[in-house]
Amino acid sequence: MKLYKEYNFNFDIDLLKKEVLKIISNTKNVHKQWALQYSKIPGYYNDVDLGYGSGSREENKITNWNEELENSYIKECVYKVHPNPSNTRIMLLNLGQCYPTHVDGYRSRYQIPVFTVPPLDYFAFPKDKVIFSMYPGKAYWVNTHAYHSYVNGVEAPRINIIFNDAADEFDETPQQTLEHKNLRKIIKKHKEIINEVHHHG
């Protein structure tokens, strides 16, 4: 089962950071998510995903862009990755945190890493025993229908732009969690690899 694919677009990461930080600083959000697209009501809060792909929202109908993003570099980058995006959001994961291991009801997501420090923050697929980091300037397709988590081992927030293919339909497969010991095991192994690389570097 394919878990991810990397695309090298050579995005202007400094310009992306500037636009993303402007949105975050001007629109505080306790949920650490900012909706760049909306379904019915404009704004950065109305279409955030608090259920993390659980099917609580029809994500493929979230296709309208907030008007101030009309000529933005963010929007330009998203359309370079995919011609039919939906549910585009900025997501922030605080330092030292990770998402619960889960399965999304939508089969895949596209990711544009904005603030990231590989290999210290990374996707983890415990069931498949796979870890991978995302690099600035690139974009990624991620199979979120597989058990996955995201781990931020950096002493700063991790910030990504994330969106769907609007043609992707919700799958009724129930969300499930995986025993945390499986996640801890591969995180420990990943830390050992990082330490070895730094030691020999």
What spans do the regions from the language model cover?
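A short glycine-rich, His/Asp/Glu-containing loop-to-beta-strand
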Residues: 75-95
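C-terminal interaction module
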Residues: 175-201
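Asparagine-centered strand-capping/turn motif at beta-strand->loop junctions
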Residues: 149-154
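Non-heme Fe(II)/2-oxoglutarate
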Residues: 1-79
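Conserved metal-binding segment of the jelly-roll/cupin
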Residues: 132-148
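Short, conserved beta-strand element in jelly-roll/cupin
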Residues: 92-94, 103-120
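A short hydrophobic beta-strand segment most commonly corresponding to one strand
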Residues: 109-114, 139-141, 155-172
